[in-house]
Curated annotation (Swiss-Prot):
Name of the protein in question: Ubiquinone biosynthesis protein COQ4, mitochondrial
Encoding gene, per UniProt annotation: COQ4
Superkingdom per UniProt: Eukaryota
InterPro entries with a match to the protein in the record: Coq4 (IPR007715), Coq4_euk (IPR027540)
Catalytic activity entry: a 4-hydroxy-3-methoxy-5-(all-trans-polyprenyl)benzoate + H(+) = a 2-methoxy-6-(all-trans-polyprenyl)phenol + CO2
Organism: Chaetomium globosum (strain ATCC 6205 / CBS 148.51 / DSM 1962 / NBRC 6347 / NRRL 1970)
One BP annotation, GO: ubiquinone biosynthetic process
Keyword Zinc: yes
UniProt miscellaneous comment: This protein may be expected to contain an N-terminal transit peptide but none has been predicted.
Pathway where it operates: Cofactor biosynthesis; ubiquinone biosynthesis
Keywords associated with the record: Lyase, Membrane, Metal-binding, Mitochondrion, Mitochondrion inner membrane, Ubiquinone biosynthesis, Zinc
Disulphide connectivity of cysteines: none
Length: 234
Protein backbone atom coordinates (compact mmCIF):
# COMPACT_ATOMS: atom_id res chain seq x y z
CA UNK A 1 0.00 0.00 0.00
CA UNK A 2 2.33 2.64 -1.32
CA UNK A 3 5.13 3.23 1.19
CA UNK A 4 2.95 4.29 4.06
CA UNK A 5 1.98 2.66 7.31
CA UNK A 6 -0.34 -0.38 6.90
CA UNK A 7 -3.46 0.67 8.76
CA UNK A 8 -3.98 -2.66 10.53
CA UNK A 9 -0.47 -2.87 12.04
CA UNK A 10 -1.38 -1.12 15.28
CA UNK A 11 -4.33 -3.43 15.86
CA UNK A 12 -2.26 -6.54 15.18
CA UNK A 13 0.56 -5.48 17.48
CA UNK A 14 -1.97 -4.91 20.22
CA UNK A 15 -3.80 -8.06 20.11
CA UNK A 16 -6.36 -12.90 -10.21
CA UNK A 17 -9.84 -12.28 -10.26
CA UNK A 18 -11.47 -11.43 -13.61
CA UNK A 19 -12.69 -7.89 -14.29
CA UNK A 20 -16.44 -7.45 -14.10
CA UNK A 21 -18.98 -4.85 -15.00
CA UNK A 22 -19.93 -1.98 -12.67
CA UNK A 23 -23.12 -2.26 -10.61
CA UNK A 24 -26.21 -2.64 -12.79
CA UNK A 25 -28.89 -1.49 -10.33
CA UNK A 26 -28.00 2.17 -10.62
CA UNK A 27 -30.95 4.59 -10.72
CA UNK A 28 -30.59 8.00 -12.35
CA UNK A 29 -32.00 10.71 -10.10
CA UNK A 30 -33.08 14.23 -10.85
CA UNK A 31 -31.07 16.71 -8.73
CA UNK A 32 -34.06 17.73 -6.60
CA UNK A 33 -34.99 14.07 -6.05
CA UNK A 34 -31.48 13.15 -4.94
CA UNK A 35 -31.42 16.01 -2.47
CA UNK A 36 -34.35 14.43 -0.63
CA UNK A 37 -32.58 11.11 -0.08
CA UNK A 38 -30.77 12.06 3.15
CA UNK A 39 -33.95 13.23 4.85
CA UNK A 40 -35.93 10.26 3.61
CA UNK A 41 -33.35 7.78 4.84
CA UNK A 42 -33.23 9.41 8.26
CA UNK A 43 -36.95 9.88 8.79
CA UNK A 44 -38.41 6.76 7.22
CA UNK A 45 -38.85 3.90 9.70
CA UNK A 46 -36.28 1.19 9.14
CA UNK A 47 -38.55 -1.90 9.45
CA UNK A 48 -36.79 -5.05 8.25
CA UNK A 49 -33.01 -5.25 8.34
CA UNK A 50 -32.68 -5.18 4.56
CA UNK A 51 -34.75 -2.00 4.35
CA UNK A 52 -32.63 -0.38 7.04
CA UNK A 53 -29.47 -1.28 5.14
CA UNK A 54 -30.94 0.08 1.90
CA UNK A 55 -31.81 3.39 3.55
CA UNK A 56 -28.33 3.71 5.04
CA UNK A 57 -26.79 2.92 1.65
CA UNK A 58 -28.97 5.56 -0.04
CA UNK A 59 -28.00 8.12 2.59
CA UNK A 60 -24.31 7.30 2.11
CA UNK A 61 -24.59 7.86 -1.64
CA UNK A 62 -26.56 11.09 -1.30
CA UNK A 63 -24.08 12.63 1.13
CA UNK A 64 -21.06 11.51 -0.92
CA UNK A 65 -22.08 13.57 -3.94
CA UNK A 66 -21.06 15.76 -5.52
CA UNK A 67 -17.72 16.46 -3.81
CA UNK A 68 -16.60 13.58 -1.62
CA UNK A 69 -16.94 10.66 -4.02
CA UNK A 70 -15.06 12.64 -6.68
CA UNK A 71 -12.29 13.32 -4.17
CA UNK A 72 -12.02 9.58 -3.50
CA UNK A 73 -12.06 8.81 -7.23
CA UNK A 74 -9.29 11.36 -7.77
CA UNK A 75 -7.23 9.70 -5.02
CA UNK A 76 -7.48 6.47 -6.99
CA UNK A 77 -6.51 8.19 -10.22
CA UNK A 78 -3.43 9.59 -8.48
CA UNK A 79 -2.25 6.09 -7.54
CA UNK A 80 -0.88 3.50 -10.01
CA UNK A 81 -2.71 0.75 -8.12
CA UNK A 82 -5.86 2.83 -7.88
CA UNK A 83 -5.80 3.37 -11.63
CA UNK A 84 -5.47 -0.38 -12.18
CA UNK A 85 -8.48 -1.01 -9.94
CA UNK A 86 -10.52 1.55 -11.86
CA UNK A 87 -9.49 -0.04 -15.15
CA UNK A 88 -10.14 -3.65 -14.06
CA UNK A 89 -13.21 -2.90 -11.90
CA UNK A 90 -12.94 -6.12 -9.86
CA UNK A 91 -15.80 -7.10 -7.59
CA UNK A 92 -15.44 -8.72 -4.17
CA UNK A 93 -17.88 -11.62 -3.88
CA UNK A 94 -17.82 -15.13 -2.44
CA UNK A 95 -17.36 -16.46 -5.97
CA UNK A 96 -14.70 -14.07 -7.22
CA UNK A 97 -12.59 -14.61 -4.10
CA UNK A 98 -13.10 -18.40 -4.02
CA UNK A 99 -13.76 -18.66 -0.29
CA UNK A 100 -13.07 -22.43 -0.07
CA UNK A 101 -9.58 -21.78 -1.43
CA UNK A 102 -9.02 -18.97 1.07
CA UNK A 103 -9.94 -21.38 3.88
CA UNK A 104 -7.15 -23.67 2.68
CA UNK A 105 -4.49 -20.96 2.97
CA UNK A 106 -2.12 -20.99 5.96
CA UNK A 107 -3.28 -19.10 9.07
CA UNK A 108 -1.81 -15.61 9.17
CA UNK A 109 -2.19 -14.96 5.46
CA UNK A 110 -4.43 -12.14 4.29
CA UNK A 111 -6.87 -14.51 2.61
CA UNK A 112 -7.19 -16.92 5.53
CA UNK A 113 -7.53 -14.05 8.02
CA UNK A 114 -10.30 -12.56 5.89
CA UNK A 115 -12.34 -15.73 5.43
CA UNK A 116 -11.84 -16.79 9.06
CA UNK A 117 -13.32 -13.46 10.13
CA UNK A 118 -16.28 -13.93 7.75
CA UNK A 119 -16.93 -17.40 9.16
CA UNK A 120 -16.57 -16.28 12.77
CA UNK A 121 -18.91 -13.31 12.36
CA UNK A 122 -21.37 -15.15 10.13
CA UNK A 123 -21.25 -12.58 7.33
CA UNK A 124 -20.86 -12.80 3.56
CA UNK A 125 -19.25 -10.50 0.96
CA UNK A 126 -22.38 -10.94 -1.15
CA UNK A 127 -24.61 -8.77 1.04
CA UNK A 128 -23.33 -5.33 0.05
CA UNK A 129 -26.00 -3.09 -1.46
CA UNK A 130 -25.58 -2.13 -5.10
CA UNK A 131 -24.95 1.57 -5.74
CA UNK A 132 -28.08 3.18 -7.18
CA UNK A 133 -27.94 6.94 -6.69
CA UNK A 134 -24.56 8.04 -8.05
CA UNK A 135 -24.91 8.98 -11.71
CA UNK A 136 -21.25 8.94 -12.74
CA UNK A 137 -20.44 5.30 -13.58
CA UNK A 138 -16.82 5.52 -12.42
CA UNK A 139 -17.77 7.16 -9.13
CA UNK A 140 -20.53 4.58 -8.66
CA UNK A 141 -17.88 1.88 -8.93
CA UNK A 142 -15.67 3.69 -6.39
CA UNK A 143 -18.53 3.63 -3.88
CA UNK A 144 -19.21 -0.04 -4.62
CA UNK A 145 -15.52 -0.84 -4.15
CA UNK A 146 -15.48 1.02 -0.83
CA UNK A 147 -18.43 -1.04 0.40
CA UNK A 148 -17.01 -4.36 -0.72
CA UNK A 149 -13.61 -3.69 0.90
CA UNK A 150 -15.16 -2.92 4.29
CA UNK A 151 -14.94 -6.49 5.59
CA UNK A 152 -11.22 -6.64 4.83
CA UNK A 153 -10.75 -3.75 7.24
CA UNK A 154 -12.77 -5.61 9.87
CA UNK A 155 -10.79 -8.81 9.37
CA UNK A 156 -7.33 -7.30 9.50
CA UNK A 157 -8.06 -5.13 12.54
CA UNK A 158 -10.03 -7.86 14.29
CA UNK A 159 -12.91 -5.47 14.96
CA UNK A 160 -16.22 -7.38 15.24
CA UNK A 161 -19.54 -6.38 13.69
CA UNK A 162 -21.03 -5.33 17.01
CA UNK A 163 -21.79 -1.61 17.44
CA UNK A 164 -18.52 -0.81 19.20
CA UNK A 165 -16.44 -2.40 16.46
CA UNK A 166 -18.49 -0.87 13.67
CA UNK A 167 -18.31 2.65 15.09
CA UNK A 168 -14.55 2.34 15.59
CA UNK A 169 -14.08 1.21 12.01
CA UNK A 170 -16.32 4.00 10.70
CA UNK A 171 -14.13 6.51 12.55
CA UNK A 172 -11.08 5.04 10.83
CA UNK A 173 -12.82 5.16 7.45
CA UNK A 174 -13.82 8.79 7.95
CA UNK A 175 -10.25 9.82 8.76
CA UNK A 176 -9.03 7.97 5.68
CA UNK A 177 -11.77 8.57 3.09
CA UNK A 178 -13.65 11.68 4.34
CA UNK A 179 -16.96 10.14 3.23
CA UNK A 180 -19.61 12.00 5.27
CA UNK A 181 -21.65 8.92 6.19
CA UNK A 182 -18.67 7.37 7.94
CA UNK A 183 -18.20 10.51 10.04
CA UNK A 184 -21.89 10.75 10.90
CA UNK A 185 -21.85 7.10 11.94
CA UNK A 186 -19.40 7.94 14.72
CA UNK A 187 -22.24 9.68 16.57
CA UNK A 188 -23.67 6.22 17.15
CA UNK A 189 -21.11 6.01 19.96
CA UNK A 190 -23.66 7.94 22.02
CA UNK A 191 -25.86 4.84 22.04
CA UNK A 192 -23.17 2.61 23.53
CA UNK A 193 -23.19 1.53 27.15
CA UNK A 194 -21.24 3.80 29.49
CA UNK A 195 -18.32 1.37 29.75
CA UNK A 196 -18.27 0.97 25.97
CA UNK A 197 -18.34 4.74 25.41
CA UNK A 198 -15.42 5.18 27.77
CA UNK A 199 -13.42 2.45 26.04
CA UNK A 200 -14.32 3.92 22.65
CA UNK A 201 -13.19 7.41 23.67
CA UNK A 202 -9.98 6.28 25.34
CA UNK A 203 -8.86 3.51 23.00
CA UNK A 204 -10.78 3.00 19.77
CA UNK A 205 -11.37 6.59 18.65
CA UNK A 206 -7.74 7.72 19.10
CA UNK A 207 -6.57 4.54 17.34
CA UNK A 208 -9.01 5.05 14.47
CA UNK A 209 -8.20 8.71 13.84
CA UNK A 210 -4.46 8.26 14.21
CA UNK A 211 -4.24 5.30 11.85
CA UNK A 212 -6.85 6.57 9.41
CA UNK A 213 -4.82 9.74 8.90
CA UNK A 214 -1.50 7.91 8.94
CA UNK A 215 -2.38 5.18 6.44
CA UNK A 216 -2.27 5.49 2.69
CA UNK A 217 -5.67 5.68 0.97
CA UNK A 218 -7.10 2.23 1.69
CA UNK A 219 -9.33 2.48 -1.38
CA UNK A 220 -6.13 1.94 -3.40
CA UNK A 221 -5.46 -1.51 -1.92
CA UNK A 222 -5.92 -4.26 -4.51
CA UNK A 223 -7.10 -6.82 -1.97
CA UNK A 224 -7.33 -9.63 -4.51
CA UNK A 225 -3.54 -9.65 -4.98
CA UNK A 226 -1.96 -10.19 -1.51
CA UNK A 227 -4.35 -12.95 -0.38
CA UNK A 228 -1.55 -15.52 -0.13
CA UNK A 229 0.85 -13.16 1.64
CA UNK A 230 1.40 -12.92 5.36
CA UNK A 231 -0.67 -10.19 7.03
CA UNK A 232 2.27 -8.62 8.85
CA UNK A 233 4.32 -8.40 5.66
CA UNK A 234 1.50 -7.02 3.52
Amino acid sequence: MANKFPFWAAAISSQQQQPSDPPQQHSLQAPNSRSLLPSRSLTRPAGPTTLGHDLIAAFAEATATPYFIYRLRDAMLASPTGRRILRDRPRITSTSLNLPYLRSLPPGTVGHTYVAWLDREGVSPDTRSAVRYIDDAECAYVMQRYRECHDFYHALTGLPVVREGEVALKAFEFANTLLPMTGLSVFAAATLKRSERRRFGEIYLPWALRNGLRAAEVINMYWEEPLERDVVGS
